[in-house]
Regions:
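Cytosolic catalytic cores of cyclic-nucleotide second-messenger enzymes
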Residues: 195
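Conserved NTP-donor binding/palm subdomain of two-metal-ion nucleotidyltransferases/polymerases, i.e.
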Residues: 1-113, 119-187, 192
């Protein structure tokens, strides 16, 4: 592993409250490459303090703010969608994305792209599809063997988000044994983080 990557990893593992501790000196010409690494790995908010006195600081700050805004918008989308299904007696489980945010030092730093919900019961899944259609969720064409995709656009902002409604945990060719998940097993491991 090269020294630049080691510096990047050190930036990620150094406590936020002491960004100067044990970091090697960073030469000015290394900052663009460190920025590119953090951007590629969606970790810009974590390295922001180290760029405070550089010309890249405002760009990283702006991208970090955008990530955090996106987090709150997807959080709102998640709450809206789960509440809608719950109101109709449909139990669903949040997968990946926002459900992992609690594992981060700052939950808002978790980069999010869409909402993944899993519905174990086939009849509930079919009902959910009808409910979503009636409430403005539009089909989004995507070839997939384990979920259907919907696009929802908030009227006030015009911002749209994708929902992947899973009827299997993973694709049949990814890891088939993961799919026969029982409702009892899901209930035993259900968490209410962020919802």
């Amino acid at each position: 592993m090269d020294s630049l990557y080691n510096t990047y990893l050190k930036m990620l593992t150094t406590p936020f409250d002491d960004p100067s501790s044990d970091l090697p000196d960073i030469s000015p010409e290394d900052y663009p490459a460190l920025f590119a690494l953090a951007d590629r790995h969606c970790t810009l908010p974590f390295v922001l303090p180290y760029f405070r006195n550089t010309g890249l600081y405002s760009q990283i700050l702006q991208k970090s703010k955008h990530m955090m805004l996106n987090y709150y918008q997807i959080d709102q989308f998640t709450r809206r969608t789960v509440s809608l299904l719950k109101k109709h007696g449909i139990t669903c489980f949040v997968m990946k994305g926002i459900s992992l945010a609690a594992s981060y030092p700052v939950p808002e730093y978790r980069k999010l792209g869409d909402l993944d919900l899993y519905i174990n019961d086939k009849k509930d899944f079919q009902r959910a599809e009808q409910i979503l259609h009636k409430n403005g969720y539009l089909d989004e064409e995507e070839p997939c063997d384990h979920h259907t995709t919907y696009r929802y656009t908030f009227e006030k902002t015009g911002r749209s988000f994708l929902l992947e409604l899973h009827y299997r945990v993973v694709g049949v060719y990814q890891y088939k044994p993961a799919n026969p998940v029982s409702y009892t097993h899901l209930r035993a491991h259900e968490t209410s983080a962020h919802l």
